[in-house]
Amino acid sequence: MALQASPLTAPLRLSAQPATKQRYWVIVFAVTLAILAYIDRVAISYAAPLISSDLGLSRSEMGAIFSAFALAYALFEIPGGWLGDRMGPRRVLLRITVWWSVFTAVTGGMWSFGSMFVARFLFGAGEAGCFPNLTKAFTTWLPRQERVRAQGITWMFARWGGAFTPPLVLLVLSFTTWRWAFVLFGALGALWVTAFALWFRDRPRDNPRVNSAELQLIGDAQDGGHGDVPWGKLIRSRSVWLLWAQYFLLSYPWYFYITWLPTYLQSPTGRGLSAGDAAQYAVYPLLFGGFGSLTCGLISSRFDRWTGSIKISRRLISCAGFAGASAFLLLSMRIQDPLWAMVAMGMASFSNDLVMPCAWGSCMDVGGKFAGTLSGSMNMMGNLAGFVAPLVGGFILQSTGDNWNVLLYLMAAVYCGGMICWPFIDSSTSLDCDDARPAAM
């Protein structure tokens, strides 16, 4: 006679069921959106000569168009993250991806400096909420020990998306105009939005493909609901202020790699390379940076187990990253051969991006239910650095007669400032814990 399952045995049999792996689809969606975001963001840099020629734009006007994106991106970081905390990342990501994809396509129809400036500003306003809301989704869908790895993988592909945008843009421009190229890039967003809308839910338990064993593995992450942001706690938290400061100091040198680096490589007072060689070497920081993000994602959980504390492991990795970035940058100045100098600068970027997953992972752990707001405010500081750094760099070069060493020494010093922040950041205490108890690993 067959045994009937009793109420006591049914839960045991259910808990022994192998966990599904649906949570990893969140990482897949994050990676593809990060690549798409960087393609849409960087494409204009490589189409700029054609745009300037067609619209009759001066260098200063083209520079202002670049700044329009950075300014909007910085201004709308906190609202984008706050909306994710209030409404959930699903609704926000769907809306902002449609928004920025539309304005990517609209870029191809602009006819003047003013219209292009407005289009790129509105594009930046939409894309600003991307990474804070992906971080919010990670907070809800991933167990604590997998979050930094997910950030590392996401930022690796984001960097590599930027690195491979130049050949992609050149390929598209080989069979169409710059105007239709932006329409094509904008259309890619519709594919992502459709797939994401069909699969993603704010809470794992609302996705029928996630079984009970995986829900148990995810743990209390899935309970992160929406609520009023505790602005008082946010402003009074030392860790929050230091996360803001370290990200500004991390982003300031990084923007050299994606703004002034090609000019440095071609300048007679820099490396004096041809335009072709400069284009080849300029991708090194993006390529090496991607490996840095991946490395941090792979080693972070091991460091957590080795130290027994996410607070200590994040501090060790981040301090090492800042110190290495400063040291390799100084080393690159001492090397005469351009190839090996760029390898050293690539290692500075590698070290730079060791910090990235730790910073975003700490936003998830410190922010808790309010990870969207915290990560948005942190990323705002990074983009303010992106607004300031090119301006300061231009002033230094103009004041010193293109003395690039002054600029590079300043960047190395800025990295040292970031290293000083991390020993005082506590990644183990969440803002949404009323009793401020350290969060379990």
Task: Indicate where each model-derived feature is located.
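Conserved MFS/SLC helix-loop-helix module at the cytosolic interface between two early adjacent transmembrane helices
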Residues: L75-G114
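A membrane-interface helix-boundary motif in multi-pass transporters
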Residues: S174-A187, A275, S313-L316, F395-V414
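Helix-loop-helix hairpin linking two adjacent transmembrane segments in secondary transporters
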Residues: T154, A158-N207
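C-terminal ends and interior cores of transmembrane alpha-helices
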Residues: V98-W111, C319-Q336
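Extracytoplasmic
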Residues: W25-R59, Y257-P262
